[in-house]
Design a protein with these regions (language model features):
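Thiamine diphosphate
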Residues: 1-153
Length: 153
């Protein structure tokens, strides 16, 4: 959570991008709720259709969605279909060889700088940030774009 809060501050200070930070205590419960609602809607086609908790909470959000997890990307991806727009997931896929949490998060690209890059990339895909500026962002944040993919170690 600290990395996400740090990323939100960088987005605000350096790029004038406001970020709302949400915390997920259980992706499993969000998924279970959404699947239960989906099943109910399937079995009750002539009833008013229900919305999952996640869909209700995010329905009026107009920004981009980035999930950063110390678990594999599949965890936030497991609820992505109930987001109103594309979810950009960051996670710790692969095998880490790091001596500290800070180094581990950098290795797996789930630290503040990678969260900032993910958010700005998602905004660029929606035409809300200049794609031509992304290389400058990568340099400014000190990200090595040619680093080996941590999933391949």
């Amino acid at each position: 959570m600290n990395e996400v809060l740090k990323a939100a501050q960088i987005l605000e200070d350096d790029y004038k991008v406001a970020a709302d930070v949400w915390s997920v205590t259980s992706y499993k419960e969000l998924r279970r709720d959404a699947l239960e609602v989906e099943r109910w809607n399937l079995l009750h086609p002539n009833e008013p259709q229900k919305q999952s908790y996640l869909s209700r909470m995010l329905a009026k959000e107009d920004g981009v969605f980035v999930a950063s997890s110390d678990y594999v990307k599949a965890l936030p991806d497991s609820v992505s279909k109930w987001f109103p727009r594309t979810l950009f997931s960051l996670g710790t896929d692969g095998f880490g060889r790091s001596d500290s949490r800070e180094a581990l998060r950098d290795f797996f690209e789930v630290d503040a700088k990678h969260i900032v890059l993910a958010a700005l990339t998602a905004l660029a895909k929606e035409g809300k940030f200049k794609t031509t500026e992304l290389n400058k962002v990568i340099k400014r944040l000190g990200i090595n774009p040619d680093k080996k993919n941590p999933m391949r170690f």
